[in-house]
Each structure stands twice: as structure tokens, then as C-alpha cells.
């Protein structure tokens, strides 16, 4: 897995390394101030290339989805005023390469199922339980978009 991650910049496999501890502290600060954190070039060039090749190879088997939902993945609720996110829809027209299509040696599967990434994220979210999402279609997927596809603004429901 270390060849998938840019382990020089992100030595997440060395839990007590000062560089890893600083990465966690910086990410926690970003989360506190902005609600998100950014890990530029987290994947190594090899890892990025391997994931891209895998996604391209499996693209033709992607599950298509074309729906209208609220940003909460629900049907509109007209008890809310017009324009309210609970009473407005956005279009979700994308295709997903799901976990069940990924081989056992898939680079993204190795990253997701390995303990290093889970431990790293758990360490930067102290006190929060963190589990892998086990749904074979909902977890660990590549989102494939073609011309005119769109993924409307929404709140994520999983990892």
C-alpha cells in the first residue's frame, strides 16, 4: 500500500512519526476552521495512475443512476417553504464502479481495507468512532461521469 500513497509526504504507516503527528494536527486545525481538510498529492504518481487505469478498465461496467433528490437524498418535503433544501431537488446523473467489481489487488481496495488509512483518519477525528462502510454498492466506488452527467450539491451520507 505504501506505493499507492505518497508516503514521503504522508507517512501514515508510521503512526508516531513527528511528520505524521504534524499532519494530523494540521488537518485537525483545518477541520476546526473550515470544516474540511486537504491532502494535496496524497496518492503517489504510481497510485494515481493505477487507480485511473482501474477506473477506465471498469468504466463500461458502471451502474448508471439518474435521479432527482433533495441534497439529503430524500424526496422533497412540501411542508418546507419553496427553495428550502428539504423541498428542492438536484439532479444525480452519474455512474458508479462499485466495490463488488474491484479485484482483491485493486489499489483503491487495498487503501480502503488497509489499517493505515483508517488509523490515520481515526487519529485526526479523536473521540469519533470510525468504521468502514460495508455496503458493496455504496462503499468504495469510482464515480464515472460522462457528458451531461451531474452530481448535484448534496450532503455525503458515507465515507
Spans of features found by a protein language model:
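Non-heme Fe(II)-dependent double-stranded beta-helix
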Residues: 2-33, 40-120
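Catalytic core of non-heme Fe(II) oxygenases with the double-stranded beta-helix
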Residues: 100-109, 113-159
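Conserved hydrophobic/aromatic beta-strand scaffold that supports enzyme active sites
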Residues: 36-38, 142
Amino acid at each position: 500500500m505504501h506505493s499507492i500513497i505518497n508516503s514521503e509526504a504522508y507517512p501514515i504507516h508510521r503512526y508516531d512519526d513527528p511528520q505524521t503527528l504534524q499532519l494530523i494536527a494540521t488537518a485537525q486545525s483545518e477541520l476546526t476552521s473550515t470544516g474540511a481538510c486537504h491532502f494535496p498529492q496524497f496518492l503517489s504518481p504510481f497510485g494515481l495512475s493505477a487507480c485511473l487505469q482501474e477506473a477506465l478498465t471498469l468504466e463500461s461496467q458502471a451502474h448508471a443512476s439518474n435521479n432527482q433528490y433533495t441534497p439529503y437524498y430524500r424526496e422533497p418535503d412540501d411542508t418546507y417553504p419553496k427553495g428550502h433544501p428539504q423541498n428542492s431537488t438536484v439532479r444525480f446523473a452519474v455512474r458508479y464502479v462499485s466495490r463488488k467489481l474491484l479485484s482483491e489487488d485493486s489499489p483503491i481496495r487495498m487503501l480502503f481495507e488497509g489499517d493505515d488509512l483508517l488509523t490515520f483518519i481515526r487519529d485526526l477525528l479523536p473521540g469519533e468512532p470510525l468504521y468502514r462502510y460495508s455496503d458493496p454498492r455504496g462503499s468504495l466506488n469510482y464515480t464515472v461521469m460522462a457528458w451531461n452527467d451531474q452530481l448535484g450539491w448534496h450532503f455525503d451520507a458515507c465515507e
